[in-house]
Swiss-Prot record:
GO CC terms, sorted: cytoplasm
Hydrolase is among the record's keywords: no
UniProt keyword annotations, A-Z: Cytoplasm, Lyase, Schiff base
A single GO BP: 2-deoxyribose 1-phosphate catabolic process
InterPro entries cross-referenced by the UniProt entry: Aldolase_TIM, DeoC, DeoC/FbaB/LacD_aldolase, DeoC_typeI
The name this protein goes by in its record: Deoxyribose-phosphate aldolase 2
Function: Catalyzes a reversible aldol reaction between acetaldehyde and D-glyceraldehyde 3-phosphate to generate 2-deoxy-D-ribose 5-phosphate.
Length: 220
């Protein structure tokens, strides 16, 4: 297993500077991570710097609340891809899920999948805000909507991935959809637990520390 190619090297803090973006790009190139995951404002720059590097550009849509309109999420997706994004991590409408408005949740995801035009779409369900049945339902809706991954967390809601949630999500979606664990994966031990539970992608700001087998002190 090439552990580096499971990692989306992530910097999503609102105060992120160009210097910090340069740093994670340089690290991603050095370690040959799967992608760099940045906010949409940094996508074009990251795409230019990562051109022909083999490292993908991942960005986030409706982030971190998931509470923007479906049309807004679709436009954000189209704009991001036009600017060079390879992968899209979107946040579901969490309130709609809790209301039982499952058609709205699925249509929201479907609109982003359509706007992504074949690019990889990962669906963040924010597990820390959901109970067991809601995690199952959100995972089912993600699969039904045609997304590629179901993802645990934004890292902004006070909790992150757990091995138990990852396993539940993977058991729900089966072989057709992959699972991304993010939030609180800070070291090699955390990384291995998530992979053993069924994750095939890890979102973390601690990619370098994971590769070096060291502890990191970041929440995402």
């Amino acid at each position: 297993m090439n552990s580096a190619k499971l990692i989306d090297h992530t910097l999503l803090k609102p105060e992120s500077t160009r210097t910090q973006i340069d740093q994670i790009i340089d690290e991603a190139k050095a370690y040959n991570f799967k992608s760099v995951c940045v906010n949409p404002t940094h996508v074009k720059y990251a795409a230019e710097r990562l051109d022909d590097s083999g490292v993908l550009v991942c960005t986030v849509i409706g982030f971190p609340l998931g509470a923007s309109t479906t049309a807004t999420k679709a436009f954000e997706t189209e704009d991001a891809i036009q600017n060079g994004a390879d992968e899209i991590d979107m946040v579901i409408n969490i309130g709609a899920l809790k209301d039982g408005r499952f058609d709205d949740v699925q249509q929201d995801i479907e609109a982003v999948v359509k706007a992504a035009k074949g690019h990889t779409v990962k669906v963040i369900i924010e597990t820390v805000l959901l109970n067991h049945d809601e995690i199952v339902k959100a995972s089912e809706l993600t699969k039904a909507a045609g997304a590629d991954f179901v993802k645990t967390s934004t890292g902004f809601a006070g909790g992150g991935a757990t091995a138990e949630d990852v396993k539940l999500m993977k058991d729900t979606v089966g072989a057709d959809v992959e699972v991304k664990a993010s939030g609180g994966v800070r070291n090699l031990e955390d990384f291995n637990k998530m992979v053993e539970a069924g994750a095939t992608r890890i979102g973390a700001s601690a990619g370098v520390q994971i590769m070096q087998g060291l502890e990191a002190d970041s929440d995402y």
